[in-house]
Amino acid sequence: MSRALDKAGRWIGWAFFADLANGLALTFGYMFSRPVTMQYPDKEKWLPYSRYRGHHFLKRDDEGEIKCVACELCARICPCDCIEVVPYEDEKGNRRPAKFEIDTARCLFCGLCEDACPADAIALGQQYEFSSFSSRDLVIGRDDLLAKPGKAMTGGGVVAARLNTERDVLVEASEPRGYNWWRNIRRK
């Protein structure tokens, strides 16, 4: 009986040693490979893909008027109830939002508001840096939503960290620089 236990104990010991050796080999393989950490925000910034859903913004029509007709469909379809719209009628009889606020602290950035809008007035942009120390600062009003930039048609790379200070958006470099970490992730 003890002889069988000794054989089983040796076999279990070798199995654990093999697992330990595999784990150490993987660790040493990553230790001597090139790092995948980006030096953010000082040296490099990430350009989101064109389908990325970041901050919200409101669109204007050709005459410079807000496209929103205050139908409140975006507020009704929102799963987290973070959109508040208060309508009014202007002097021409057009329905416009007197108050349009989005609480980005509660928002899921699902894009349902963008899909539900019949006037194509609300969209999700590509800005991903809007952190704050207070949740009250994350409630964005109508005027701020109108001032935000729209979507870029390119993206998905790493560029040098340069900002256009007038619009607070990234200026794309002539060619993306930096380490393309996504291409070099090891997959089994």
Curated annotation (Swiss-Prot):
It is a peripheral membrane protein. This is NADH-quinone oxidoreductase subunit I 2. It is an enzyme of class 7 (translocase). NCBIfam families: NuoI. Belongs to the complex I 23 kDa subunit family. It comes from the Bacteria. [4Fe-4S] cluster 1 binds at residues 68, 71, 74, 117. One of its GO terms (molecular function) is iron ion binding. Its EC number is 7.1.1.-. It catalyses: a quinone + NADH + 5 H(+)(in) = a quinol + NAD(+) + 4 H(+)(out). It holds the Pfam family Fer4_7. Its cofactor is [4Fe-4S] cluster. Keywords: 4Fe-4S, Cell inner membrane, Cell membrane, Iron, Iron-sulfur, Membrane, Metal-binding, NAD, Plasmid, Quinone, Repeat, Translocase, Ubiquinone. InterPro entries: 4Fe4S_Fe-S-bd (IPR017896), 4Fe4S_Fe_S_CS (IPR017900), NADH_quinone_OxRdtase_chainI (IPR010226). The lineage of its organism: Bacteria, Pseudomonadati, Pseudomonadota, Alphaproteobacteria, Hyphomicrobiales. Residues 56-88, 98-127 form the 4Fe-4S ferredoxin-type domain. PANTHER family: NADH DEHYDROGENASE UBIQUINONE IRON-SULFUR PROTEIN 8, MITOCHONDRIAL (PTHR10849), NADH-QUINONE OXIDOREDUCTASE SUBUNIT I 2 (PTHR10849:SF24). The keyword Oxidoreductase does not apply. One of its GO terms (cellular component) is plasma membrane. It is found in: Cell inner membrane. NDH-1 shuttles electrons from NADH, via FMN and iron-sulfur (Fe-S) centers, to quinones in the respiratory chain. The immediate electron acceptor for the enzyme in this species is believed to be ubiquinone. Couples the redox reaction to proton translocation (for every two electrons transferred, four hydrogen ions are translocated across the cytoplasmic membrane), and thus conserves the redox energy in a proton gradient.
